[in-house]
């Protein structure tokens, strides 16, 4: 229901998305992860038809939203920076979105307003970031779309409302809705997504189920040496799919026999200790990137 094939987008000399192929099927929830400027927001805007691809193609519900904008009525989209007319109230905005989509049952809107604890009578400009985000979430869900494309959807929401949002997403997936959401909050992705697509510098680094990623996290070793270790020590070693060097400590992620890595480690004088590394998904993310996850800059 959501598809990209060798999708690329360039802005002059900058490549924001490079040869990205990804598919999200009916009832599937895919978390889209990446550090600053990774290309997540650009990918979502390409899917929505707001940008022209430089090469490759993308489709939603079997068509291009760029050339078939009527398909947007069946898509729920939440941009990363949701802005509306500051004078319009929540009710005004819901009526406006309802007209755009050919009509929405008021009962559905009222239900979402109650679940997200929103006062729809206040003007948008007078609302906090969290309450503005609630309006964004409601407009994305209120017409019961077949596809949800959500950019940092829980930004600004308090923990209680975040839990309600997760329930809305799961309910949508149970109805067969395809969900693609970007996030930098790894526990959120771990709870909600069936698969995780990790992007860096516009390229897909990995596409795995959450269970597979956690399994990879459990196949990690921490090696402690007496002296600082060259960053290239475990490069191209069979079975080592990622490595992180921090002075005298190396964390390696294995996808195969441990023997070749241990042979390299033991061949270097001063190996002091080998122990299991953390099995947290966030630590695996850091190993894949060599840096901590952070908010997208909407590249």
Question: How should these model regions be labeled?
Answer:
Residues 1-8, 291-299:
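ABC-family P-loop ATPase nucleotide-binding domain
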Residues 95, 187, 211, 263, ...:
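Active-site phosphate/pyrophosphate- and oxyanion-stabilizing loops and adjacent acidic/basic residues
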């Amino acid at each position: 229901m959501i598809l990209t094939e060798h999708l690329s987008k360039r802005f002059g000399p900058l490549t924001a998305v490079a040869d990205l192929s990804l598919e999200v099927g009916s009832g599937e929830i895919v978390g889209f992860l990446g550090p600053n400027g990774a290309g997540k927001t650009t990918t979502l805007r390409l899917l929505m038809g707001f940008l022209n691809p430089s090469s490759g193609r993308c489709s939603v519900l079997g068509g291009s939203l760029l050339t078939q904008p009527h398909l947007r009525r069946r898509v729920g989209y939440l941009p990363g920076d949701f802005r509306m007319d500051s004078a319009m109230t929540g009710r005004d905005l819901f009526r406006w979105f309802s007209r755009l989509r050919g009509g929405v049952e008021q009962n559905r809107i009222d239900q979402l307003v109650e679940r997200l604890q929103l006062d729809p009578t206040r003007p948008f400009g007078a609302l906090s970031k969290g309450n503005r985000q609630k309006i964004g979430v409601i407009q994305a869900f209120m017409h019961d779309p077949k596809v949800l494309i959500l950019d940092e959807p829980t930004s600004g929401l308090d923990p209680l409302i975040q839990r309600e949002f997760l329930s809305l997403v799961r309910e949508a997936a149970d109805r067969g809705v395809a969900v693609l959401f970007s996030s930098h909050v790894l526990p959120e992705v771990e709870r909600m997504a069936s698969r995780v697509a990790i992007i860096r510098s516009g390229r897909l680094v990995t596409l795995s189920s959450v269970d597979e990623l956690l399994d990879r996290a459990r196949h990690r070793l921490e090696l402690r040496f007496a002296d600082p270790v060259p960053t290239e020590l475990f490069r191209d070693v069979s079975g080592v799919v990622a490595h992180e060097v921090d002075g005298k400590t190396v964390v390696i992620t294995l996808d195969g026999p441990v023997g070749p890595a241990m042979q390299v480690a033991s061949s270097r004088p001063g190996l002091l200790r080998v122990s299991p590394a953390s099995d947290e998904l966030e630590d695996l993310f850091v190993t894949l990137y060599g840096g901590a996850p952070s908010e997208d800059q909407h590249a």
